[in-house]
Structures are given as structure tokens and as C-alpha cells.
Amino acid sequence: LWNSAVYGSGYDREWLNRRLIQQGGSITAFEVQCLKKMLDWWENDPATDTQRLGVIGLSYGGMYALHFGALDTRIYATYSSCWFSDRKKHNWCDWTYFNAERTFFDTETASLVFPRRLYIEVADEDEAFPASDGRQERLRLEAYAAKTGNADKLTFKEFKGKHELDLDSDALETFVKDVKGE
């Protein structure tokens, strides 16, 4: 992702997102569509086991993993790290849009992954999205998963750490088992 504060001007993500919203889309929708097209291409590789596809992402990647897993049923397991939170507290332009509060927050997006497997982790000392900011969303998601018979498809973990993947091997081992359907 382009960060003009770091890399200089020449690409204005917010301006591009506003233009896409005016056309009925968003930068997130465009980039998730790019991921879907990448998967279309990858599926044609004979070495790809199309029954064992998973997506994993950290931070912005966690957002894309969650949206991609929600929108593409070819993804069997989704792992989103250090992104799930309360969008009222983290109201950034590329994932909050007009009337968002009446439609989709993180719980609603995550619920679209079901009945496939979903692994979400949050860090207790995350500088960007502290675990405490997303506790209400977590409760909503767990209640939804239980109500719809998908509690066994959800793993939600709060770990000791910062804005990083959980370094405990259980996280990746769980994801690999989920991808394998174990």
C-alpha cells in the first residue's frame, strides 16, 4: 500500500478512494477484486489444490483477508490478525463508508466467512487496534456464530503481543489444520 508520508507524493489513496466511492465502489472493493482475479489465475496451476485454499493477513492484510474470505467461497479458511476491532473507534476512509453503521462492521463482514473456517487474533498491546477496542465486536461475532451453528468454525484469540502475528505456533498450526479441513 502506498504511504505518501513515507514514499512521497504521486499517489493519493484517499483521493482515489473518494473517486471510486463516487462511482459506487471503493479502493477496498477494487483491491479485493484484484485478489479474486489473482486466485482465478492461480487456480489454473495444476499444482494448486483448489479444495485447500486459505488466506492470511496482518493489519491491512488482515482487513483484506477478512473481506476476501467473506466474498470468495473458494477460500476454505481465513486468518485475520490485528485488524478486527470497533470501526467507530477506527474510522478510516478506506474501510468505513457512507451508512456503514447500518450495514457492515467487522462482525457482519466476518460472519460472511461462515460456514467456512475463521481464525481471528488480536493483540493485547496492539498500538493500532488494541484488543480492548474490539471486545464488543468479538462478543457479537461469537454470539452470531453460536446462534447460526458455526461456533466450531470460529477461533478467536487474544494474545500477548503488539501489532504482529501471534508468534505462538498454535495460531499457524490451527490455520493449517483449518485449511486441511481437520
PLM region descriptions:
Residues 36-109:
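Primarily recognizes the serine-hydrolase "nucleophile elbow" in alpha/beta-hydrolase
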Residues 145-182:
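C-terminal catalytic histidine-bearing segment of alpha/beta-hydrolase fold enzymes
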Residues 77, 86-146:
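The feature captures the conserved acid-bearing segment of alpha/beta-hydrolase catalytic domains
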Residues 2-4, 8-9, 62-64, 85-91, ...:
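Flexible loop/turn segments at secondary-structure boundaries
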Residues 1-44, 87-94:
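Cap/lid segment of the alpha/beta-hydrolase catalytic domain
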Residues 7, 22-30, 56, 97-104, ...:
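Alpha-helix capping and helix-loop boundary segments enriched in small/acidic/polar residues
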Residues 34-37, 64, 108, 136, ...:
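Extracytoplasmic/secreted proteins, especially bacterial periplasmic and envelope-associated proteins
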Residues 2, 79, 119-121, 157:
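Hydrophobic/aromatic beta-strand patches that form the interior of the parallel beta-sheet core
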